[in-house]
């Protein structure tokens, strides 16, 4: 099978790279290895939330924050990709979201500040409309609503924590729980269960009535925060309909996995690529690459019990990171799955981790060292293959978790890698 460019990955970087190639008139193939951690970590596109991992002061304007970060850290992936790639990539993504039927908002000119499921403020750049009413730059009181039998969102915890960091004379956060109509007491729900139930108009209407009764407010100046379960496939209709029924602003809050918001985002974008003519190869992880005369001539996929070779003029490795299984971790070393080079070696395996879950983890910085064109670098300091380009979390030397920059880096490097692949 021969293509212009083969994109390997299952996340936002892979999707942005594929879309960029498609819009440039190329014939890409998207090799989707399988379920990735993006279903668990993505709900918004976070470009740059904090300028360093230890500060609690959010970045107000992502464009300005990234420009300053590039000036201070010229070897950062944002610097390699370039501010122009971030700007153009975000423009590409926002236009694509609209074309694919999403209702999102945001820009590089400002960050929203949104409450998490635990009630901590979190800066985000691009968000679904269904989350916008939760912006903590507004002062209206918040009522967090949970559901009996659904344990992935604890409204009392969210209200307590948010009160400490955000509450004040004109701000308040409280919590309620309601029983869901049509179910026996003791029933346990998942996010998917609830998302499907909320697509029923009658169910929505009765839930809205119960929330009004439990909240004991007339709706004037109050907003309601719910776990993100307002529809699985028809969310653009469910959220505004439910908000009308309730008579108050409603916002969704991302919860524990599986993330309904992420399922909506990635499944719909992936489907849109297929509907517009992009070939997608499913559940076929790449396990080897053939290099001749400094160029990759083909990659090999594990597909349905057989080896499947893919040939292309260029390749974009838009893998995620060690959490997604993009790298092969042994006791003492971590290898990449294509060229089988050692990316990291630890005499003591525990050096890869920090005992504290809330501190930066060394393993998160493992990945490909790249050139200024995002080509993977070998042990000799030269590109392993001149027509291979890396995007996303597989680039070495940074951990986006603390700075809330995973989405921005995926967009910038995915877009830049696609442009380099076109020129290869």
Model-derived regions, located:
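Glycine-rich FAD pyrophosphate-binding loop
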Residues: 23-43
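Glycine-/small-residue-rich beta->alpha transition segments that form the dinucleotide
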Residues: 34, 304-305, 312-314, 318-325, ...
């Amino acid at each position: 099978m021969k293509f212009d460019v083969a994109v390997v990955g299952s996340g936002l970087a892979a999707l942005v790279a594929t879309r960029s190639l498609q819009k440039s008139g190329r014939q890409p193939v998207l090799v989707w290895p399988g379920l990735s951690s993006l279903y668990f970590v993505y709900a918004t596109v976070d470009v740059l939330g904090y300028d360093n991992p230890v500060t609690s002061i959010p970045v107000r304007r992502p464009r300005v924050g990234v420009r300053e970060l590039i000036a201070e850290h010229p070897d950062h992936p944002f610097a390699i990709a370039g501010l122009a790639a971030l700007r153009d990539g975000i423009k590409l993504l926002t236009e694509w979201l609209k074309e694919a039927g999403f209702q999102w908002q945001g820009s590089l000119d400002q960050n929203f500040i949104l409450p998490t499921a635990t009630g901590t403020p979190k800066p985000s750049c691009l968000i679904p409309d269904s989350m916008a009413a939760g912006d903590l730059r507004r002062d209206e009181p918040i009522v967090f609503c949970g559901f009996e039998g659904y344990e992935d969102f604890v409204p009392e915890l969210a209200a307590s924590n948010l009160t400490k960091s955000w509450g004040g004379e004109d701000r308040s956060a409280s919590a309620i729980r309601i029983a869901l109509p049509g179910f026996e007491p003791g029933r346990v729900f998942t996010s998917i269960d609830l998302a499907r139930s909320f697509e029923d108009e009658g169910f929505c209407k009765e839930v809205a009535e119960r929330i009004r009764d439990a909240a004991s407010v007339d709706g004037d100046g109050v907003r309601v925060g719910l776990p993100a379960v307002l529809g699985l496939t028809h969310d653009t209709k469910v959220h505004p309909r439910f908000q009308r029924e309730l008579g108050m602003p409603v916002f969704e809050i991302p919860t524990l996995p599986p993330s309904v918001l992420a399922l909506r985002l990635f499944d719909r974008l992936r489907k849109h690529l297929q509907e517009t003519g992009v070939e997608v190869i499913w559940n076929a992880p790449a396990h080897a690459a053939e290099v001749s005369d400094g160029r990759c001539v083909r990659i090999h996929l594990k597909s349905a019990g057989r080896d499947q070779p893919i040939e292309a003029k260029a390749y974009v490795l838009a893998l995620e990171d060690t959490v997604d299984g993009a790298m092969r971790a042994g006791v003492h070393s971590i290898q990449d799955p294509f060229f089988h080079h050692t990316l990291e070696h630890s005499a003591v395996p525990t050096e890869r981790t920090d005992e504290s879950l809330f501190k930066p983890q060394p393993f998160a910085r493992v990945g490909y060292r790249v050139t200024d064109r995002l080509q993977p670098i070998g042990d000799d300091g030269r590109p392993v293959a001149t027509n291979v380009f890396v995007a996303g979390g597989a680039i070495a030397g940074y951990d986006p978790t603390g700075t809330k920059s995973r989405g921005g880096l995926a967009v910038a490097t995915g877009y830049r890698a696609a442009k380099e692949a076109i020129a290869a």
